[in-house]
Amino acid sequence: MMHLILADSELELMPEEIKKGRILLDSSLHHSLMKGLKDWKRRGRPDIVHIFLLIAQESILNKEGLLRTYVHTRNNEIIYVNPEMRIIKNYNRFKGLMQQLLIHGKVPLKGGSLMKMKKERLDELLNKIKAKKIVFSRKGKRKALQDVFEENVACIIGGFPSGNFISSVEKYADEIIRLHEEMLPAWIVAMEAIVAYENFMKLHL
């Protein structure tokens, strides 16, 4: 089983210090309002979460029942994604869904949840996952993923456009891996990790 975690993702409601109202923060729409926020240049990026989830949830690995996906936010919330969740491809509709999730803690509001959110730190989640933990970072070593994977593995990927993890992820890592000399988008790292694990598990034979 692969546990795929998007850590320190920049998914949040608009902070009250810039505007009251429960609206999803999006840097493409709220750029001028965000300049007074700490770390404003990296915040308000639901697009990263959207593309990451599209790739993860539509993967062969997920269809084979071997993937569990989580999104950890800068405000220490964990979003648990049901493997049966099919991500809305329209970005504006996806943002509406994320806004509803951040306000109410689950979607859909009635019936079984396809996504649920709880207040939880990244280390609390990692302590519950009994698997080898691999952090993807430019600070890591270049290694072939086939050489570091085990049958149960947790892959931690940064959910931010630039910079470093806010959380102390390195202290929980069994391996810190660098895929490339340049910083790669989160969804590319996720895609590389998923396909490498599919090959490790011989799903393409």
Regions found by a protein language model. Give the residues of each.
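RNA substrate-binding interface of SAM-dependent RNA methyltransferases
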Residues: 2-139, 198-203
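Conserved beta-strand elements of beta-rich interaction domains across eukaryotes
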Residues: 9-11, 140-141, 162, 183
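Short coil/turn segments at secondary-structure boundaries
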Residues: 17-19, 148, 168-170
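Short amphipathic alpha-helix with an adjacent loop that forms part of the alpha/beta core around
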Residues: 126-128, 146-149
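Short, well-ordered alpha-helix to beta-strand connector turns
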Residues: 130-131, 151-152, 172-173
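Long, charge-patterned amphipathic alpha-helical coiled-coil/hairpin "stalk" segments used as oligomerization
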Residues: 136-145, 153-164
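Structured adenosyl-cofactor binding patch, chiefly the S-adenosyl-L-methionine
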Residues: 161-205
